[in-house]
Amino acid sequence: MLKLFSAFRKNKIWDFNGGIHPPEMKTQSNGTPLRQVPLAQRFVIPLKQHIGAEGELCVSVGDKVLRGQPLTRGRGKMLPVHAPTSGTVTAIAPHSTAHPSALAELSVIIDADGEDCWIPRDGWADYRTRSREELIERIHQFGVAGLGGAGFPTGVKLQGGGDKIETLIINAAECEPYITADDRLMQDCAAQVVEGIRILAHILQPREILIGIEDNKPQAISMLRAVLADSNDISLRVIPTKYPSGGAKQLTYILTGKQVPHGGRSSDIGVLMQNVGTAYAVKRAVIDGEPITERVVTLTGEAIARPGNVWARLGTPVRHLLNDAGFCPSADQMVIMGGPLMGFTLPWLDVPVVKITNCLLAPSANELGEPQEEQSCIRCSACADACPADLLPQQLYWFSKGQQHDKATTHNIADCIECGACAWVCPSNIPLVQYFRQEKAEIAAIRQEEKRAAEAKARFEARQARLEREKAARLERHKSAAVQPAAKDKDAIAAALARVKEKQAQATQPIVIKAGERPDNSAIIAAREARKAQARAKQAELQQTNDAATVADPRKTAVEAAIARAKARKLEQQQANAEPEEQVDPRKAAVEAAIARAKARKLEQQQANAEPEEQVDPRKAAVEAAIARAKARKLEQQQTNAEPEEQVDPRKAAVEAAIARAKARKLEQQQANAEPEEQVDPRKAAVEAAIARAKARKLEQQQTNAEPEEQVDPRKAAVAAAIARAQAKKAAQQKVVNED
């Protein structure tokens, strides 16, 4: 009958499936009041102590900071962190943090100055006059986060609740063994906790406020009832001790009978839950104006001489707290951050205390039992019976081990609260929670990669669409900016295009010549004749210019005559070289000799005509004669070298000798004409006479060597000798005259 009446009572409670009853081990630490810990010399404050992104730094190395001074800026979901004491920022660098793998995260390292000075604190005792938005912003900027273990920013959680929250639940269950931080906080600070609950209720305006606490905390229950004696707006619900009654979904079901849907949140059913420690931090932030710089931490385990609960500054090294509590480590000492079921072993003791650190457990070697070897799953289903989330841990174990992420997701692995109840009851000692944590991390990484790929695809498609729009707009501008030509311009353009097309058609049209017909090349012939006539006219003008220049300058005329004679001799050599085996025609040679003599006479006449205008310098004439004689000698040598095997024609040699003698006479006449004005040096004349005699003798020797096989005509030889003797006599007479 009593059970029937209790079912209709207003404070009815429900029970969830599964759960376990491990040894509580709470009496080690809940019997002593909260105490302060001496300040450490150095504090390490990680920038990320919550779920979400880290804040933006607002301090630099070397800055002096005070307790409560912001070290980062909280924008959006980024929660700021604050200096736990006054001191100097000595470094901003990665440091190992509270993580199973001791991952390094960016941290601010502060050396304490020992003064522990606060920033100016501005409390809002009249918080009821403040708006909801102002209170949420203050809570957020003062760094308040969920202190029950999740670390979700409280301001963001309150903002997301909105006006749809009907029930505010304060979680005071603290169901995990060894942990007594909330129990001791409620015993020592019950009034402040209730005041923080009222601030949360003022922000959310719920229909009911429930405090859920397990029946294994009688002192805390007594203190809360004493504070709530005159209050009807807050209801205290004492629930049976069962692990994990402190889970958000489990406690919600116990107090309201409502189940949070798979993949959903408690706010979907009009429920919002906050921890006891969070309510206390809200009170200190709003009323006292103090950012969260410390929290209650349980120090327990048989390896600690003075177990209890302490106010630990955030950023304090774990080693400092344990040493203050009389830590006596063994050879293979293990230190667990958190409880024995949901906590993790610290790889080393220099990691700092953060906002989610609620317990430091240092058990002795035999306190938690000997670690046993993992064995194969026997499919006993004991884990499924103990699971408070109604999951199938054995199936999730196989899926996690086989990397079957889709099947693990289908079996709601995301609903696992990692309470460790399945691993506690497993007879094969399988660390199921470790497999589930790893699998959830891999699934989260895959989803994050898919999200980045989708965002990249969206950015690419948006960029392509933007480029297409810009291209279309650019083409439209070009079309609108194009100027349409007038009618007259259109006709001119059309005519020009027609001419171009006609020329292209003519150029590409092949020339076809029918059989028996002659091509009409009259145009080409006429153009060629015109070009020839133009060239002849230019040549005639050039010749007239050259003739006028030659008549005006007797020296140039003499040079041209010498060039002509050299060309004649070169032509004779080329003909001799081109016909080595052919007999020279004597008639042709005589004709060429006559032509050469005619050219020589013509040049002499030109010189004679030019002489009246300008008197020739006898010295220059002598130099030119010497040059002519040198050229004659060089030509004779070239002829001798070019025709070593060829029989020399005696007639041709006689002609050349006659030409040479004529040149000599011509030079002598020029010298005689030049003598009246200038006396010739007798020594030079004697030298020239000797040179002439030597040349004559050399010519006779060449003729003798060139005609070894042919009989020399005695008459011609006698004539040549007489001529040579006459030249010698004449030179001697000239020498005598010069000497007189």
Curated annotation (Swiss-Prot):
Q: Where [4Fe-4S] cluster 2 is bound, by residue?
A: C387, C416, C419, C422
Location in the cell reads: Cell inner membrane
- Region Disordered, as annotated, extends over 602-718
Mode of membrane association: Peripheral membrane protein
Q: Please verify whether the record's keywords include Signal.
A: no
PROSITE patterns associated with the record: 4FE4S_FER_1, 4FE4S_FER_2
Does the entry feature the keyword Translocase, yes or no?
yes
Q: Major place of localization? A: membrane
- Which GO BP terms sit in this record? electron transport chain
Listed binding positions for [4Fe-4S] cluster 1 are C377, C380, C383, C426
Recorded hits in PANTHER family, A to Z, give: ION-TRANSLOCATING OXIDOREDUCTASE COMPLEX SUBUNIT C (PTHR43034:SF2)
Q: How does it assemble?
A: The complex is composed of six subunits: RsxA, RsxB, RsxC, RsxD, RsxE and RsxG.
The UniProt entry, under NCBIfam families, shows:
PRK05035.1 (NF003454), rnfC (TIGR01945)
**Protein known as:** Ion-translocating oxidoreductase complex subunit C
Highest lineage ranks of the organism?
A: Bacteria, Pseudomonadati, Pseudomonadota, Gammaproteobacteria, Enterobacterales
